């Protein structure tokens, strides 16, 4: 068995090397290169080492708390738009806010969304991230219908209950890994919105598999990975099958219930508010969504709801802890809200709108943390920008991080300063220039961005009005394969004497 496994691994590695070698030869002298002609000039840059390009340099930089030198050195040498070679492909890297805006707005015309094959396989071809054109438009519209209305009283009440239920499980003097706790909140909230299942053994089992699935996003997709379960990608494929199977069972049951009711969801089919995303899908467009479409769609929404919002919650607490003046002002804002409401009254939309400094904190956490570092696009046609021509088929990476942390756009850009977002601050003009893009933009603007803000705001409210805390050990940020803290940000909690948790 061991010998067979080694043979399979060797075959997989050989296949990867051959595929990368062929891709390298095509990039150097294939048809695309011939089409460029003498007049077409790619942005300057370096393709690095044969086969691997600059991939190892990029990964090495992004596995540190300070990946900026990778970008800074190339921008200083080549300008805000440069060529590199990462993840097996020549890629144009943009740190230019104007070009980034062009790319975001041109989705579906000059460019289309394009991600590594590992992500595409694990999410599914019908996921919100990977669909294009009319298919993406209808999925995006459905997501907005369900997740783009955070002012809904039932949704606000559920978020409030879920956050408090999680915090009540913490001991009065507990040590917790905040990122793990935040992920429980966001995962359970997303599952509730998708399939109306409350936290319990089913959701926890699903979450454990989902962690394995996400770990495989930026791993090497070996051709025989399905036969190599000991690899990260092989484990992710296995987890994907389990997650999809669990979602499929729920969806199939709901489809059967609809059929038994003569094509209706139930007695309340005519009600304006659908109970979850599956119900939205079953009734949308005359019930035209297939079972596989619904599975892929729900699976991809779990990624959006689970990973990014939980990291935002954790980084907000980390940055506040490192900036005592900001934490003090945030505590004052939320103490005032609690004093006006009373200790046991749930938060409402009017309370959320009374958190201006909280929104400054969230904006600054998004800007400094860059939970989404940027987006991949692929050119549908030759793109002419300044003196350069980016040929059809070329991959492009629009870096939000490079823009957000550039001192030309933000004063002391690499310092956490939530006051820069106050309305009377001149640096607020940065938003008007459309260079602040933590949720993307254009047709692929994140449909749940306002909901994410609401969840983080409610979480911060209950945290600062019920607990004090301190870091138990130093924990640092890394940005590959995703933005996170290495240790999950462990903190010691102390229940405030006047709080009722």
From Swiss-Prot:
Chief location bin: membrane
Binding site for heme: 446
Membrane topology: Single-pass membrane protein
Enzyme class: oxidoreductase
SUPFAM superfamilies: Cytochrome P450
Transmembrane intervals: 2-22
UniProt pathway annotation: Plant hormone biosynthesis; brassinosteroid biosynthesis
UniProt KW keywords: Heme, Iron, Membrane, Metal-binding, Monooxygenase, Oxidoreductase, Transmembrane, Transmembrane helix
Location of the protein in the cell: Membrane
Biological process (GO), any one: brassinosteroid biosynthetic process
GO cellular component, as recorded: membrane
EC number: 1.14.99.-
Designated name of the protein: Cytochrome P450 90A4
Organism for this UniProt entry: Oryza sativa subsp. indica (Rice)
Lineage: Eukaryota, Viridiplantae, Streptophyta, Embryophyta, Tracheophyta
